[in-house]
Amino acid sequence: MALRSMRKARECWNFIRALHQGPDAAPVPQKDAVKRIFSGIQPTGIPHLGNYLGAIESWVRLQDEHDSVLYSIVDLHSITVPQDPTILRQSILDMTAALLACGINPEKSILFQQSQVSEHTQLSWILTCMVRLPRLQHLHQWKAKTAKEKHNGTVGLLTYPVLQAADILLYKSTHVPVGEDQVQHMELVQDLAQSFNKKYGEFFPVPKSILTSMKKVKSLRDPSAKMSKSDPDKLATVRITDSPEEIVQKFRKAMTDFTSEVTYEPASRGGVSNLVAIHAAVAGLPVEEVVRRSAGMDTARYKLVVADAVIEKFAPIKSEIEKLKMNKDHLEKVLQVGSARAKELAYPVCQEVKKLVGFL
């Protein structure tokens, strides 16, 4: 039954426009070129503006445009840093509610909890035994994170890109929507797929990256850094459940410069350009049109315009999250059903890998 389901799944996958593989942009694939899409998000609780514009919004579009997509709440990745079990359990449900409220539809895509599909860790160990230590130590994110922690990072933090590769390859994914900061990790995924195929015969597709159209959303208080939930400055990050008053306050305090005109010049006017990019994204307008409409407006007034646009965008999402969070049983059922569907796809792939490696 699982094999029949997988054959059926293989026949019904397709994907998107802004493809990127390695340093060169790839051509836009035709629908029949796309076999499977996978992406994941850590259970950080309620997403912020950067999560929404950088990933979730494009996920909704992708599931609507294509027949078969998997989205995972990657809780195994989250424990590479210390977690309170009670908070983690709630954060998983909060992220589930947020994804559903934003438009992720379990009938159009498979939404599941990573830790409930044991094949992820099984494949991860096999791939871990194929990658050299220096390769992981030279990844940018490992260097950056261990520098912050004074080289006290865990083995899990070092090897999480291999688990990320297993997440993707386990479903024989052909395309993966990623942000700019994940391109190097996707190169590792591609290399591991090729290494496995070279050793055991052609088995895994070599997945391609899809860069999201929205670049990193910057911190409202420091436009040189990306927006982050862990930012100690609470005015730097807009959560999608913030009240209208909180959103207005955060945009009022957003860092700009001493020039009052609204322009889009990311290299020289990072703060104002970040506001323009956010405004364009939530309003569904080109940056040029946003700048044109803002002619004659000073940045103080413009901050309120952007705040109003964000409030309008998030109002229905916020309301839906509040309703969904009141129904814990429903959220748990969504994850349970999604995890069962994911396992139905993962199990036969993992069994074939075990045969190729010599375990069966």
From Swiss-Prot:
Uppermost EC category: ligase
Which Gene3D superfamilies is this protein grouped with? HUPs, Tyrosyl-Transfer RNA Synthetase
| TM regions (residue ranges) | none
Transit peptide: which range? Answer: 1-18
Family per UniProt? Belongs to the class-I aminoacyl-tRNA synthetase family.
What EC numbers are recorded for this enzyme?
Answer: 6.1.1.2
Known InterPro entries for this protein? aa-tRNA-synth_I_CS, aa-tRNA-synth_Ic, Rossmann-like_a/b/a_fold, Trp-tRNA-ligase, Trp-tRNA-ligase_bac-type, Trp-tRNA_synthetase
Please tell me one Gene Ontology term that the record gives under cellular component: mitochondrial matrix
Indicate which residues the UniProt annotation says bind L-tryptophan.
167
The residues that hold ATP are 42, 48-51, 179-181, 217, 226-230
Q: Reaction catalysed?
A: tRNA(Trp) + L-tryptophan + ATP = L-tryptophyl-tRNA(Trp) + AMP + diphosphate + H(+)
Please name the source species.
Bos taurus (Bovine)
Q: Per its record, what are the GO molecular function terms?
A: ATP binding; tryptophan-tRNA ligase activity
Pfam families found in the cross-reference section: tRNA-synt_1b (PF00579)
What compartments host this protein?
Answer: Mitochondrion matrix; Mitochondrion
Query: Entry's PANTHER family?
Result: TRYPTOPHAN--TRNA LIGASE, MITOCHONDRIAL (PTHR43766:SF1)
Q: Which UniProt keywords apply?
A: Aminoacyl-tRNA synthetase, ATP-binding, Ligase, Mitochondrion, Nucleotide-binding, Protein biosynthesis, Transit peptide
Please identify the protein, giving its name as recorded.
Tryptophan--tRNA ligase, mitochondrial
Function in brief:
Catalyzes the attachment of tryptophan to tRNA(Trp) in a two-step reaction: tryptophan is first activated by ATP to form Trp-AMP and then transferred to the acceptor end of tRNA(Trp).
Q: Does the keyword RNA-binding apply?
A: no
Q: Which GO terms describe its biological process?
A: mitochondrial tryptophanyl-tRNA aminoacylation
Question: Is-annotated flag, keyword Transit peptide?
Answer: yes
